[in-house]
Amino acid sequence: VPGTSPDQPRNEMAMTTTRSRKALYIGLPLALVAALGAVGYAHWFSQAPGYPRPIVEQANALHEHMLSFDSHVTVPLDLGTAGNEIDKDGPGQFDLVKAGRGRLSGAALTIFGWPEIWNGPNAPHRPTPGFVDEARHQQEVRYKIITGMVRDFPNQVGIAYTPEDFRRLNGEGKFAIFISMLNAYPLGHDLSQLDLWAARGMRMFGFSYTGNNDWADSSRPLPFFNDTADALGGLSPLGEQAVKRLNDLGVIIDVSQMSTLALQDVARLSRAPVVASHSAPRALVDIPRNLSDKEMQLIKDSGGVIQVVGFGQYLKPLGKPVLDKLQALRARFDLQPLQGLANALMPGDAVIAIWPESRFGEYASSLYGILEEEPKATLKHYVDAIDYTVKKVGIDHVGISSDFNDGGGLDGWKDVGEIRNVTAELLTRGYSEADIAKLWAGNFLRVWEQVQKSAHPVALR
């Protein structure tokens, strides 16, 4: 049974209001909202047959007055288009209807730009001068999607520029958008882009994604892009300057997806707490993308928080049937047998640097097709990861993230409408309501407040 700890300086349960009568069911007359709240509860209960009814009812009651925050949801480039409307219960993992059904208070909607090398003419292809322009275009499209949501649905959603905004929006029955950014690649060498994006509302910035960039080494260097592990030895001089600038702007530094050396550099240089917005413990799946115990301790020592991610391949090792198929695939492409899982989950062998684009495309397509055959991880796997992280760093330094729309999703937590299943599993494990409130939002909001207090000056809207 997880331990407890003193309450946060601000009780995140006491500071919220009941949301079942609020206008989170988009486009519906308010007279129907209360009835649809009951429908939503019945729908959710039907999706959670594995939990005893008292646990289900307790989880439901908690989410009527507890703040909840998912720290990593990617904004799809087609969100808001026909068939993917934000105000309809569509095929994606995030929309405002699902958020209302799940009683999710808010989320970090993540703007990132990285040319998808598997798409476009003659794909896949190696970087060209147009890659940076395309990545910046993707950033702009995602930002316009977010601001368009607020423009089109002002009574249902708003942008949280501060923790106080987040609480206020929740009290008004609105979904709170926290704008985050992932991957410094599109910013080139222009440090002033951080000021621009902070002024536009960005409140968390992650240096790294797949592949190294000019600011930091990635935990997943991509040989197809001629990357090598630890090419910069952590942060570049530009990356080091960025740490100070982000601290000055009051923007949270996100260390997920960084190399170990880069994370160590950030922990050494940052005067504010840091966050891993979507990571899992390496002790459960031994890959560089996950956090080692030492890395988790560095985040704790900064005063920060580890937002455990609901990404199945980071939570449980691959089973033998899939591993056998991967070994056969590697033999077909004259690659050495797997030693560990790092190159099982991505095309990371150094020899790929000299492959023709067509050969890489065939291998990558086959690799990811095989990985799709792996049975989904479950909520039990996910809360195992939370348990482990809490044991290592304490309840005050752990939070929750999904990575929806970019690979996240579990058996029992397939979209934002099912977040109460996470709470039900936590209750089953013996977590107290106060500790669940910390995991769902309290810890992250505390860190956000501390980061903004250390700003000089605080970024302005």
Where are these regions (language model features)?
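N-terminal hydrophobic targeting/anchoring segments and the immediately downstream early-domain regions
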Residues: 16-229, 285-461
